Amino acid sequence: MKPILSDATAAPAWVVIQLLEECNLRCRMCYEWGEAGSYHALDKLAQLDLELVLRTVRECLPHRPSFEFFGGEPMLYPGIWEVIRAIREGGCELAFPTNGTLLEAHAARLVEQGPTRLWVSLDGPAEINDRQRGRGVFKRVMRGLQALEAAKRTAGSRYPELGITYVVTPSNADHVADFFLRGIDLSLLSCVSIELQSYATREQAQAYGQALSTHFGVASTPCANGYVRDPAIFSGIDMEALTAQLVEVSAACAQRGILFHSQPQTLEVENIRNYFSARWQAMIDRRSRCAIPWITAEISARGEVTTCHTFNDLPVGNIHEHSLLDIWRGERLKQLRGYLREQLFPICTACCRYWGGAGALPAPRKRDA
């Protein structure tokens, strides 16, 4: 049996591919294209060459990883159907997030090719959602969900399963229960994910930049800077009311057999308050270890390989130069893992996977990070 956090794994269990940087929305809280997003500074947007994506997918297929896309908006990628087909015909699961605005146009083809799950982003009733994501977006997404459900019924297919991702911000924190219990037909969904807005303080971003400079020779951290928010912007949220809504939606999902995920997992008032106050050490869900860098490979639209969204400033290789599996077994990733065996980065609390528990391991007894 391999030890926990072993470098001996032949391939990642989870491969996440950023097909492109382009998006057709400008959601206010997005760390890529939002008000403080890092992509506004890009001179030219990147997207991966289709043949390079397919070659990387085929390289991984014998190891049967789970795949995920992200963007930008993944459904804007011209070669998405070829990539979906290669993954699904190769016997692997595929899930990806989408803003939902293109579902109606592609409902039949999505059902025909059958990605395992789509995570559709909605942030409240129409007026509230559109305040964050853009005018008319809610209606377009709802039409898409209905078209997809109709196409699934016609084909007699369960795929793609549908999930809703709801990002809690100061603008929509009062509307969580209203949306899920009265604003959407829960019978359409197999899963619900409610995530408190990811962010980092200025001090965390600076400390992260210093760590990357000192230990890895990285000169700048523009991606990390896209997460920076002042915790004061969350001070108007009614933490008691928000927590009660989260618990209510969780119970409603449990009654209907819908998978419920929250970030953080512990739905208690003080835990939620500590999150929005950047009191990370007081969080019940805090971690001092994470398994994600040992199981996940993320490929950016520029070909750069990292192990986590929050490490996009710290690539360990590029698939334009080396194969993904060579990078996975390479010295740069071993160096990163060696660092993370001793401590996490200051920016790790800005990661949804850190709070979601997908990669969490119990903290060693000898440390209290």
Residue ranges and their predicted role:
Residues H40-A46, R131-V137, N312:
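Short glycine-enriched, charge-decorated loop/helix-capping segments at active-site entrances
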Residues R117, S121-D123, D130-R289, A301, ...:
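Radical SAM enzyme [4Fe-4S]-AdoMet core and its adjacent flexible, acidic
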Residues E22-N24, P74, T101-L102, P125, ...:
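Short, solvent-exposed loop/turn segments at secondary-structure junctions
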Residues V16-Q18, G71, P97, G163-Y166, ...:
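Short beta-strand segments
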Residues M1-A11, W33, Y275, R279-A369:
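Flexible mid-to-C-terminal extensions adjoining Fe-S/redox cofactors in radical SAM and related proteins
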Residues G34, G71, L122, L196, ...:
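Residues that line or immediately flank small-molecule/substrate-binding pockets and catalytic motifs
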Residues R26, H63, G114-P115, R158, ...:
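Short loop/turn motifs at secondary-structure junctions
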Residues M1-R117:
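Conserved alpha-helical substructure of the radical SAM core
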